[in-house]
Amino acid sequence: MNIHAYFQSFTLFAAALSSVAQNPTFPTGNPHSGEAFFKVDFPNVHGNGRSCATCHVPEEAFQLTPQHVEARYQALAQRRLTDPSADDPLFRSIDANDFADDFTNLRNHALVRVSITLPTDAAGQKLMWPVNDPTATVVAVWRSTPTVWNSAFTAPYQLDGRQPTLQAQALGALVAHSEITRDPKERFLDDVAAFQRAQFSSPAVENLSAALASGAPPPPTDPLLNIEEQRGKLLFNQHCATCHGGPTQTVPLTRLPPGIRNIRISKPVPPAGADLPFAPSPIAPRLWAFRVPGQAAPEVRSSTDPGQALLTGNIAHLNFFDIPTLYGISRTAPYFHDNSAATLEDVVRHYQVDAIFVRRVAPVGAPRPDLILDDEIPPLVAYLKKI
């Protein structure tokens, strides 16, 4: 398969995906049937052998890690020494760097290819496009596979928030990653969604979800905290709750577009003068052109992944991504949409450096984030590991 054939096959099912996304429902579904559907191949929809669990690995907190991918790659290589036809559905050409057998991004970073149709205005004119391919109607970016834990209260879904329901999310994955050639039955999607809604990072978070669903006051979710962790919670409320606010830790407390943020991850190099403590994005940057009202010439920006801008075409949404809940985060490394932070310490240090950068470039009078001090990092990380 080449890139043109890939984009053509993706476009064929865009209408079906759009129909589910635009008509969201929240039926009960059967989580027991959904578990079976989640974990096995889908024989009735003629896919490529992948199930949901191929990438959302139950034993790996329902996500995909570089270590897991590499172990499977090496195991497959060993099997092929005696059986050249041995197969693992994780390794499909759609997620190869060269659409053949180079799985560098998948093996080294657990990143999969995600295709998105470029946004257009009412007249059908594209609002943005890659500078090196102005005729493109669909583009691909490389992203991590997030956990399904706590998805009962984290809508919208996907790293850019493009799917309003778990049914739409499941169908999108079937189309893009399992390459189905037949539409699944609606009940199938309802059951898979029901199974996902039943997965939580802890019993306390499950109780929180039930309370939110019933309209009851949210119960406390913190386990017993020691003195360091208690200090970390205070620091969390000071530094992190601005975006990770509310009982679900997904409600921003600032006057910005709800649910999305630019945390300056979609850059291949650190901001000028910064020294990031973890590897920059493994993905090469591209130049993107944006149509801006009132301007004759397009604005051009560099990004490894434009995030929500790929949905809206709005340059103001460049590099914006959905705000995830942080419950269970100690078990879902690596972090960010490109898996560029290996540890929670790396994540916190990124925000430490990012705050310095924002304070330096913020216009006069604009709000400036508090700086995270070096001695605040251990207690903050200790609290994050406990929730």
Regions found by a protein language model. Give the residues of each.
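N-terminal secretory signal peptides that target proteins for export/translocation
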Residues: 1-5
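Bacterial N-terminal signal peptides
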Residues: 8-18
